[in-house]
A protein has these predicted regions:
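An N-terminal assembly and electron-transfer interface module characteristic of large anaerobic redox
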Residues: 1-322
Length: 322
């Protein structure tokens, strides 16, 4: 058998957040309660599908299994279903008691330890899922993983109970945190320069950030930006477009006390945005940090560089000249 050469074209959806919704059950429980559990799984998944979107507005894939996890064999089956669908976030909606080791723990064994998992449950019911939730969360904590518990409300009776609005809101909030975690994993932020304030909050903790979030920190020297400004390593036509756009929106509020000098510095500030933006695209970065302190723009021993405030404002906005 020959080795397979992979295509250089990668599906853009590879590694995207996918939420899998499931429920455990107890094989001794009556059929009506089992059907109710399946309906809760379906309802929770449908509600999330209508609420969860990525930053670009595209819907996040939500999948669910109507196989109730009674024991290890069902846990394996649902886990494989989820893995085929690319699931990397787990939402468990238990409505009955069950056995943690035979159910969710066996399912979790198929996934990386840092896979986000949420338990959303009602607070009572004849065979309370909330008891299962706390027992399972305790078992998971004992092997060194934290989970999120959302004890909410849905009707104790009826075959198709719906979680109330607050329960759903809490679950949706958690899902957004989870898709952010998954979306950042394997990505990077770019940090230019060092910290000159001596503040702990300004230090880039490379190892902890990698271990906790799977997020890399690319560190670049400020010299690169200084050189690229000097070499005018940016699209000059785009700079004109950006300056025109800025003046079109804020011309009366732009103060240039030393007209020619300050106008040139304004252009450099805008050029800095274009340079850093292109570097971030090149590195596939999702964010960054910039040391805009004494030696960059104010040290009389050096060449004055443009203030980075405009660049920062544009990066923290959802729009620019494009």
């Amino acid at each position: 058998m020959n080795a397979k050469l992979l295509s250089r074209e990668v599906n853009k959806g590879t590694g995207a957040p996918v939420i899998g919704v499931f429920a455990p059950c107890d094989p001794r429980i009556d059929q009506a309660s089992r059907e109710r559990s399946i309906n809760i799984v379906k309802s929770a998944a449908q509600k999330l599908a209508s609420k969860i979107k990525q930053p670009d507005g595209k819907a996040v894939d939500i999948v669910y299994s109507d196989i109730l996890i009674d024991a290890e064999s069902q846990a394996d089956q649902v886990a494989r279903q989820f893995k085929e669908a690319g699931v990397n976030i787990l939402v468990c909606v238990p409505d009955t008691w069950s056995f943690p080791q035979l159910t969710t723990l066996s399912l979790m064994a198929h996934f990386p330890k840092d896979t986000p998992i949420n338990f959303t449950t009602g607070n009572s019911a004849p065979r309370p899922g909330v008891v299962y939730t706390h027992a399972t969360a305790g078992a998971i904590a004992q092997f060194g993983k934290l989970t999120h518990i959302n004890v909410g409300k849905w009707p104790d009776t009826g075959q198709a109970p719906e979680m109330d609005d607050q329960t759903l809101e809490n679950l949706v909030d958690w899902c957004y945190a989870a898709i952010t975690f998954i979306g950042l994993r394997g990505r990077r932020v770019v940090v230019f320069g060092h910290d000159s304030m001596g503040m702990e909050t300004a230090l880039a903790h490379v190892l902890e950030t990698r271990n906790q979030f799977g997020l890399e920190i690319t560190r670049l020297d400020m010299k690169l930006l200084s050189d690229m400004l000097q070499k005018e390593s940016y699209d000059k036509e785009e700079l004109k477009k950006l300056r025109s756009w800025l003046e079109g929106h804020a011309k009366d509020r732009i103060e240039l006390p030393e007209l020619e000098k300050d106008s040139e510095l304004l252009d450099k500030s805008l050029a800095l945005y274009l340079i850093v933006r292109d570097l971030m695209v090149e590195l596939d970065a999702v964010g960054g940090g910039f040391m805009s302190q004494l030696e960059w723009g104010s040290d009389s021993r050096a060449i004055q560089q443009p203030v980075a405030d405009i660049m920062e404002s544009l990066f923290n906005s959802t729009f620019d000249h494009n």
